[in-house]
Amino acid sequence: MVGWSGNPLFDLFKLPEEHNELRATIRALAEKEIAPHAADVDQRARFPEEALAALNASGFNAIHVPEEYGGQGADSVAACIVIEEVARVDASASLIPAVNKLGTMGLILRGSEELKKQVLPSLAAEGAMASYALSEREAGSDAASMRTRAKADGDDWILNGFKCWITNGGKSTWYTVMAVTDPDKGANGISAFIVHKDDEGFSIGPKEKKLGIKGSPTTELYFDKCRIPGDRIIGEPGTGFKTALATLDHTRPTIGAQAVGIAQGALDAAIVYTKDRKQFGESISTFQSIQFMLADMAMKVEAARLIVYAAAARAERGEPDLGFISAASKCFASDIAMEVTTDAVQLFGGAGYTSDFPVERFMRDAKITQIYEGTNQIQRVVMSRALLR
């Protein structure tokens, strides 16, 4: 037994070296290829093409795709690290790897081998993107009340209806779509399908005008007698809602990772600014009130990072009952991101309220992490049900 003076081989809560190397690599790429364009992407509400090109070239656009389909087969913690480091400089760009995972996780978990071979290699090798279509205007938190329908027609499926709040809508090649196949069975009458952007009867609505993540288009999807091949169903008919929930169990930590990255970016900017800013003849970082704010911000970010990585690790191990920890990681990290970015703006004073500095963008971008993939109120419902069942 090693003495209490310290054991350098004790690796509990310590990431493997390959994860640290991954962080260094993606951070360097993000700072060089993505950060210089982040302000312009936000101000012009344009898609971060530079980020997409850099992520595609490095293989970080869909690092989660298994090796047997041409991907890197990175684990869930590695995927979170990539998303976190990109979000640290540009939250919109971080939605490229994040939503590629969201849009394909149901397929990876429940899809047929043939369908996986049809879809996944295009993300890994061709730079295709994927999106996830669950919500509708009148079926948000109550997703099971969706009205989009899918009906068998010979060897095909015909989809009718629409979806809303689709991240990267119009940029993705593939869409995982939930639709009702048996209205009499409620949630057990929902099925999951893969729709291609060129499928007959499928179209994209206009981009939403948003508070934040302006570089990532958010659109509606329209299905007007949209015909897709019969083999593009994920799993068996009636299992789609379960697939949707299983997907979110695996991907909510990625939104937590995005939130951690946003918060870290704001904290980093605040540290630099407070050290440089002088009032009363000295750096404001020498004032105890400022020091305490920075300390609290850093403490919260570190705690959020740990719960996100813990949730991702449990998902990677395939542990059962992921609902609580997955919801907790997303909920806690996103609440922290909103707190930390707000404090960062405060530390900048009036300058922080302008677009001359990135913290106002971080603050606007942070808000959505409390909303998408289930509002934080719904996350608390998920957690409380897990506690009380």
From Swiss-Prot:
Pfam families named in the record: Acyl-CoA_dh_1, Acyl-CoA_dh_M, Acyl-CoA_dh_N
Cofactor: FAD
Signal peptide start-end: none
Domain of life: Bacteria
GO molecular function: acyl-CoA dehydrogenase activity; flavin adenine dinucleotide binding
Catalytic activity, EC: 1.3.99.-
SUPFAM superfamilies referenced in this protein's UniProt entry, alphabetically: Acyl-CoA dehydrogenase C-terminal domain-like, Acyl-CoA dehydrogenase NM domain-like
Gene3D superfamilies, per the entry: Acyl-CoA dehydrogenase/oxidase, N-terminal domain, Butyryl-CoA Dehydrogenase, subunit A, domain 2, Butyryl-CoA Dehydrogenase, subunit A, domain 3
InterPro entries, alphabetized: Acyl-CoA_DH_CS, Acyl-CoA_Oxase/DH_mid-dom, Acyl-CoA_Oxase/DH_mid-dom_sf, AcylCo_DH-like_C, AcylCo_DH/oxidase_C, AcylCoA_DH/ox_N, AcylCoA_DH/ox_N_sf, AcylCoA_DH/oxidase_NM_dom_sf
Keyword vocabulary terms for this entry: FAD, Flavoprotein, Oxidoreductase
Protein name, entry field: Probable acyl-CoA dehydrogenase fadE25
Gene that produces this protein: fadE25
